[in-house]
Design a protein with these regions (language model features):
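Compositionally biased, intrinsically disordered low-complexity regions enriched for acidic
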Residues: 1-86, 90, 102, 123-143
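Intrinsically disordered, low-complexity, Lys/Arg-biased terminal tails
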Residues: 94, 98-153
């Protein structure tokens, strides 16, 4: 019988493998989550992040860089167990707090693992699109932008 080996992520230093390509400030400037991720609750974040940010109190698809809706509903996030009490808005909220220096090891490990797994969408764009064809796979490009990967590949 063939043994199946699972990659043991626990042995990895999660902080070393986490290398986002975009800062929260840059992501907000480019246009993510229809501009409405935080609503009006932005006081805990640096003001400089919002100087050129595309923000709105309600979701506005025209504020997304690729003008498409990308991602799943909040209800789906909750159903999948992707929302934690520490970051009730989800991954991007965690990322912003992480960038600002907050560390909660068990949450960081989960979120960094989720970020790492999202790279499959970068690979899909690279395999299926001509380099620089920003009209190709716009939904995936918007999604990887919302996960701090460079969508301009």
């Amino acid at each position: 019988m063939k043994k199946v080996y699972k990659k043991n992520m626990e042995n990895l230093d999660f902080y070393k493998i986490f290398k986002p390509q975009l800062s929260p400030k840059k992501m907000l400037e480019l246009g993510i989550f229809g501009g409405s991720y935080f609503g009006s609750n932005i006081k805990e974040y640096p003001k400089s992040w919002f100087e050129k940010a595309k923000i709105s109190k309600t979701f506005d698809i025209t504020l997304n860089r690729f003008r498409v809706k990308a991602g799943l509903s909040r209800e789906h996030w909750i159903e999948k167990g992707w929302i934690f009490k520490e970051d009730p808005l989800g991954w991007f909220q965690w990322y912003c707090r992480f960038i600002n220096g907050r560390r909660i090891t068990h949450i960081d490990e989960i979120q960094i693992k989720r970020w790492k797994n999202f790279k499959r969408h970068v690979t899909a764009i690279e395999k299926n699109c001509e380099r620089g064809d920003l009209g190709c796979r716009k939904r995936q490009r918007q999604a990887i932008l919302q996960w701090a990967y460079n969508p301009f590949i």
